[in-house]
Amino acid sequence: MENIMTLPKIKHVRAWFIGGATAEKGAGGGDYHDQGGNHWIDDHIATPMSKYRDYEQSRQSFGINVLGTLIVEVEAENGQTGFAVSTAGEMGCFIVEKHLNRFIEGKCVSDIKLIHDQMLGATMYYSGSGGLVMNTISCVDLALWDLFGKVVGLPVYKLLGGAVRDEIQFYATGARPDLAKEMGFIGGKMPAHWGPHDGDAGIRKDAAMVADMREKCGPDFWLMLDCWMSQDVNYATKLAHACAPFNLKWIEECLPPQQYEGYRELKRNAPAGMMVTSGEHHGTLQSFRTLAETGIDIMQPDVGWCGGLTTLVEIAALAKSRGQLVVPHGSSVYSHHAVITFTNTPFSEFLMTSPDCSTLRPQFDPILLDEPVPVNGRIHKSVLDKPGFGVELNRDCHLKRPYSH
């Protein structure tokens, strides 16, 4: 009988943060909203807070960047480490070091599903179905997958069963789809700038933006509109129809996450041929099952927020059983290793984090080292052929560890 590899146990889990409310803005990293001045991502973009004039001009004005980046590292008893980043900051550090550590340390590095289930169960009474706690659990889960891959010497996508395609093709999210086209992306997703409080004038302005970009990009380049939970059903329906003449491919996250009936109605009333998408701010498999039942066309979980890679794999299987697509929200290498194994993810998202969208900057810069970016809008699977997620932690980022155990 052949020898079976003996896997080590997890000896330590540690949590750091960078950025957040007490830091100078512009730390970047896992909290990619934390950018410096004159950045498109902090421009006049429609949000649930836009109806308040004091908070409509900038997303940082209402505190979108107060959490900062959470970094979780797990260390095996043989000294190997895995890590991941997400958006949870100092509060996420507390949850990891003071609560979740008991479910991690002492377990085998392969006990990812067991640890995941225990973290979900133990936090259920204070986590709800998403938000800060789910971001933290996601970060731990991703760190565990990174460690497991490094211990066995395989990239995460091979742990999931291997690639189903040779490369990932991307659309770009940012303010300049025309520049994205020049870089080889298959499409560009723009932020909506106006909402229900702006009335029909807001609809006309955003439709005019789409029309202008259609003229610049030509008839075949995909154009999409990201509404970031800022609308109601009536406004979103009107906006979708106003943009239909310009061949808008989809309209995204128009409504708050829990408005499932609203999504059902929006899908029913959207223009023929225009897709309705959402899921970025949903967490847990159960919430995605409810979202899937609304009939939307694409579910868009963020692997750093939805429950981690373990949950993302479950969401993809759920969507596949219903004939729906899963196109994760951003998330760089943490998504790349997943989507290249999903048959119902024919393309993926690349988030433009350069201030004016004129250059390709890694999404989680500067916290990750060796983070790949698309070349001509694509990443070949060979780029992912490194153990774990294939990136390293930049320890020059002044990591802060506020708690220990």
Curated annotation (Swiss-Prot):
<feature type="binding site">
    <location>
        <position position="349"/>
    </location>
    <ligand>
        <name>substrate</name>
    </ligand>
</feature>
<keyword id="KW-0456">Lyase</keyword>
<dbReference type="GO" id="GO:0016052">
    <property type="term" value="P:carbohydrate catabolic process"/>
</dbReference>
<dbReference type="GO" id="GO:0050032">
    <property type="term" value="F:L-rhamnonate dehydratase activity"/>
</dbReference>
<keyword id="KW-0460">Magnesium</keyword>
<dbReference type="InterPro" id="IPR013342">
    <property type="entry name" value="Mandelate_racemase_C"/>
</dbReference>
<dbReference type="InterPro" id="IPR046945">
    <property type="entry name" value="RHMD-like"/>
</dbReference>
<keyword id="KW-0479">Metal-binding</keyword>
<feature type="binding site">
    <location>
        <position position="33"/>
    </location>
    <ligand>
        <name>substrate</name>
    </ligand>
</feature>
<feature type="binding site">
    <location>
        <position position="59"/>
    </location>
    <ligand>
        <name>substrate</name>
    </ligand>
</feature>
<comment type="similarity">
    <text>Belongs to the mandelate racemase/muconate lactonizing enzyme family. RhamD subfamily.</text>
</comment>
<dbReference type="InterPro" id="IPR029065">
    <property type="entry name" value="Enolase_C-like"/>
</dbReference>
<dbReference type="InterPro" id="IPR029017">
    <property type="entry name" value="Enolase-like_N"/>
</dbReference>
<protein>
    <recommendedName>
        <fullName>L-rhamnonate dehydratase</fullName>
        <ecNumber>4.2.1.90</ecNumber>
    </recommendedName>
</protein>
<comment type="function">
    <text>Catalyzes the dehydration of L-rhamnonate to 2-keto-3-deoxy-L-rhamnonate (KDR).</text>
</comment>
<feature type="site" description="Transition state stabilizer">
    <location>
        <position position="349"/>
    </location>
</feature>
<dbReference type="InterPro" id="IPR013341">
    <property type="entry name" value="Mandelate_racemase_N_dom"/>
</dbReference>
<dbReference type="Pfam" id="PF13378">
    <property type="entry name" value="MR_MLE_C"/>
</dbReference>
<feature type="binding site">
    <location>
        <position position="280"/>
    </location>
    <ligand>
        <name>Mg(2+)</name>
    </ligand>
</feature>
<dbReference type="Pfam" id="PF02746">
    <property type="entry name" value="MR_MLE_N"/>
</dbReference>
<dbReference type="InterPro" id="IPR023444">
    <property type="entry name" value="L-Rhamnon_dehydrat"/>
</dbReference>
<dbReference type="InterPro" id="IPR036849">
    <property type="entry name" value="Enolase-like_C_sf"/>
</dbReference>
<comment type="subunit">
    <text>Homooctamer; tetramer of dimers.</text>
</comment>
<dbReference type="GO" id="GO:0000287">
    <property type="term" value="F:magnesium ion binding"/>
</dbReference>
<dbReference type="InterPro" id="IPR018110">
    <property type="entry name" value="Mandel_Rmase/mucon_lact_enz_CS"/>
</dbReference>
<dbReference type="GO" id="GO:0009063">
    <property type="term" value="P:amino acid catabolic process"/>
</dbReference>
<feature type="site" description="Increases basicity of active site His">
    <location>
        <position position="302"/>
    </location>
</feature>
<feature type="active site" description="Proton acceptor">
    <location>
        <position position="329"/>
    </location>
</feature>
<feature type="binding site">
    <location>
        <position position="226"/>
    </location>
    <ligand>
        <name>Mg(2+)</name>
    </ligand>
</feature>
<feature type="binding site">
    <location>
        <position position="252"/>
    </location>
    <ligand>
        <name>Mg(2+)</name>
    </ligand>
</feature>
